[in-house]
């Protein structure tokens, strides 16, 4: 069966990898819609190659510029309404949500209402509104298929298994760019240092989140919703080689793991063609060449953001959305070299501490908490500077 796919975030790291997968298997995958933020040069190339029915960009000006360069066969939209139009296009049956940040939340929700299966790479959607998204998926008979390598690994390990027989999920982490640095050494490190990820090629925001281990915290929160497992049963393990993507330990002591080369095209292809597999020409894993694998506990004193994520996830309500929003603000300013690395964790902590949590929040309450946290975090950092 041919999958008709819309990609939210087609010019980012996940989006371009996804289009590589589509190019490799044109008999199985067709592109219906694409969205970009500001990179219309790359989007224009993608439009010419994949001939989508609809695309969306960030602003009306960018949409007008794009119209001058492409044929009238592709509808061009913009803004949040444009994202939603792509996500809900009637010709698609699978939506890859790979935009960065909480901007992926509304289009994902609308896609579920339109009964689309979701290949989910946008962590923040489940972090901020996991209870809403998972319930909508159930109500509409939609599948949430994970794309992150860690969640794809768990998803594959649990195929055919009974959730009641799970003892724990073990999410692996490379440790990020600063894994071998001391707290003292990290004080003066800048964005250019954090962007040198040891194993994966990722977007800038995600690479900074990896350096703070906030990314791993988000993945723990995501796993809680994807697999309906309490936080007490989700562990993190540092695995520097990024060969074992995650593990599941069962109540009888058996441990199942999924291994593969660190190439995002593999979990993307698995998600796109689920429930069956396709052959690929990507690098195959050779354990004899690797020789040995290493594991250690994460240092929560060195990387407190991981602990914050656990705590906020357990609190629930609007607190996870606040955690995410404060992180987005601080991350963006660190990327501009306007704040120090440790200001990220300080901003997150202070913003979460100041928040008045709303239990079992509506979507509106989550969005209000998100906006409040952005304003509060910005004010904290303005005062600091």
UniProtKB/Swiss-Prot annotation:
Residues binding Mn(2+), per UniProt: 148, 150, 219
A single GO BP: isopentenyl diphosphate biosynthetic process, methylerythritol 4-phosphate pathway involved in terpenoid biosynthetic process
Record EC number: 1.1.1.267
Pathway per the UniProt entry: Isoprenoid biosynthesis; isopentenyl diphosphate biosynthesis via DXP pathway; isopentenyl diphosphate from 1-deoxy-D-xylulose 5-phosphate: step 1/6
Binding site for 1-deoxy-D-xylulose 5-phosphate: 123, 149-150, 174, 197, 210, 215-216, 219
Enzyme class name: oxidoreductase
Co-factor(s): Mg(2+); Mn(2+)
Binding residues annotated for NADPH, in chain numbering: 11-14, 39, 122, 124, 203
The keyword Metal-binding is annotated on this UniProt entry: yes
Role this protein plays: Catalyzes the NADPH-dependent rearrangement and reduction of 1-deoxy-D-xylulose-5-phosphate (DXP) to 2-C-methyl-D-erythritol 4-phosphate (MEP).
Name of the protein in its database record: 1-deoxy-D-xylulose 5-phosphate reductoisomerase 1
Gene source species: Bacillus cereus (strain ZK / E33L)
Catalytic activity field: 2-C-methyl-D-erythritol 4-phosphate + NADP(+) = 1-deoxy-D-xylulose 5-phosphate + NADPH + H(+)
Single GO term (MF): 1-deoxy-D-xylulose-5-phosphate reductoisomerase activity
Recorded family membership: Belongs to the DXR family.
Superkingdom of origin: Bacteria
Keywords, sorted A to Z: Isoprene biosynthesis, Manganese, Metal-binding, NADP, Oxidoreductase
A Pfam family annotated for this UniProt entry: DXP_reductoisom
